Amino acid sequence: MVKELATETNILAIESSCDETAAAIVSDGTRVRANIIASQIAVHRRFGGVVPEIASRHHMENIVPVVSEALATAGLAFSDVDAVAVTYGPGLVGALLVGVAYAKSLAYALGKPLIGVHHLLGHIYAGFLAYPGLPLPAVSLVVSGGHTNLVYLEDHTTRRILGSTRDDAAGEAFDKVARVLGLPYPGGPELEKLAREGNPRAIPFPRAWLEENSLDFSFSGLKSAVINYLHHARQVGQEVNRADVAASFQAAVAEVLVTKTLLAATSYRARSILLAGGVAANSVLRRELRSAGEQAGLPVFFPPRELCTDNAAMIGCAAYYQYLRRDFAPLSLNAIPDLPLN
């Protein structure tokens, strides 16, 4: 049972699963009083992707000033914090350990509850920050660099994974195709920008539907088809319209994601659809999913773009619902890089 609280609950949330060191203060699961992010994009760009060891070292440098800035922005002291929340998986183990170790130390020093939050659950709850009254049950499409999942949310305590990727995640495919197109890191936003100049119907790249009514995903074949198309064109000296390649690839990914999400939502009689994760910032995916939802009579919700990428506000929102049911973590909490959503 969810317990009603008479006073405002302030949660200090920490996120360090990949290459952003983030801290936020979230009150009552809806009011973001501070959301501070120290990004490492510029650091990793020259390597074409995140270097785990470098990411961990920068988290160690950033964690204290980021938390201090979050408290200052919120106008709060440590004594005003009711609980400390932290992402403990999935993610890069070294990066996760920095956030988890700091959060455990802080919770112990303050004598406050520690709340361990699943990173993907945080992405889902970014939607509840923007839409606290989002109708449940809902189907959430979670799309990021490392994950692609369809999740059924019956309420704030019960969820079920309906489908997952069998190989590459959608965001991973975006990044790899962007790389072969010669686009800078991070590839997803750059590919979307290039695709605006192209024809999404120019190249009939394959769509992997898998078995009939399957809610799983597969993007490795599509990724390989794009790479093979580019390699063949270069071998025969054929000029390649990179914008058409980007647009056609993006259209193929969006079509599969949208079709399977609508199938899940209608099959499980969801009252709404929630888009979440870094790829949720993609304009084509947003437009196509909203259009499909309208045709099916289902409202579609997605967070503002600043809450789609990794941040601590989403962790604070998810943690609030765990706080209500006293779902606290022991001080022995450890980082779990392959933490399952179930």
Curated annotation (Swiss-Prot):
Binding site for substrate: 142-146, 175, 188, 282
GO biological process, one term: tRNA threonylcarbamoyladenosine modification
Cofactor note: Binds 1 Fe(2+) ion per subunit.
Cellular compartments per GO CC: cytoplasm
Known EC number: 2.3.1.234
Cell compartment(s), UniProt: Cytoplasm
Keyword check for Transcription: no
Cofactor(s) essential for the protein: Fe(2+)
GO molecular function, one term: iron ion binding
Catalysed conversion reaction: L-threonylcarbamoyladenylate + adenosine(37) in tRNA = N(6)-L-threonylcarbamoyladenosine(37) in tRNA + AMP + H(+)
Domain of life: Bacteria
Keywords, alphabetical: Acyltransferase, Cytoplasm, Iron, Metal-binding, Transferase, tRNA processing
Entry function: Required for the formation of a threonylcarbamoyl group on adenosine at position 37 (t(6)A37) in tRNAs that read codons beginning with adenine. Is involved in the transfer of the threonylcarbamoyl moiety of threonylcarbamoyl-AMP (TC-AMP) to the N6 group of A37, together with TsaE and TsaB. TsaD likely plays a direct catalytic role in this reaction.
Protein name stated in the entry: tRNA N6-adenosine threonylcarbamoyltransferase
